[in-house]
Amino acid sequence: MMKVLVVVALLVTLISYSSSEGIDDLETDELLSLMANEQTRAKACTPRYYDCSHDRHSCCRSSMFKDVCTCFYPEGGDNKEVCTCQQPKHLKYMEKATDKIKNLFG
C-alpha cells in the first residue's frame, strides 16, 4: 500500500511539473506586454509628509521600506483629522543602521 502511495505521489509531481513547463513556454512578447500593462496601471505614490487622506495606501517607498499613512488631530481645537505619509521611527533607525553597515563594508 505504501509503494502505491509513493508511486501516485511521484506521478502527481511529474504531471504538475510537466504542466508548469507549458506555462513557461509563453512567448516573451506576451510576457512583456503583460508587464507593460501592469506598470501603466500603477498609480502615483504620495511623497513623505504630504496628505494621504484620499488614499491611505498610496505612500511612497523609501530606500527599504514603504512609508505609512499616519492620521492625527492637530492641536488648536480643530476636529478635522489630518493624514500624512510618514516613516515610523523604528524603520528609520533600521535604514540608518543598514546604510552605516553598507558604508563600513562597502
Swiss-Prot record:
Primary localisation category: secreted
Disulfide bonds: C45-C60, C52-C69, C59-C85, C71-C83
Subcellular localization(s) per the UniProt record: Secreted
Molecular-function annotations in GO: toxin activity
Keyword 4Fe-4S: no
Maturation propeptide residues: 21-41
Family, per entry: Belongs to the neurotoxin 19 (CSTX) family. 02 (D7) subfamily.
Domain remark in the UniProt entry: The presence of a 'disulfide through disulfide knot' structurally defines this protein as a knottin.
Record protein name field: Toxin-like structure LSTX-D5
Organism of derivation: Lycosa singoriensis (Wolf spider)
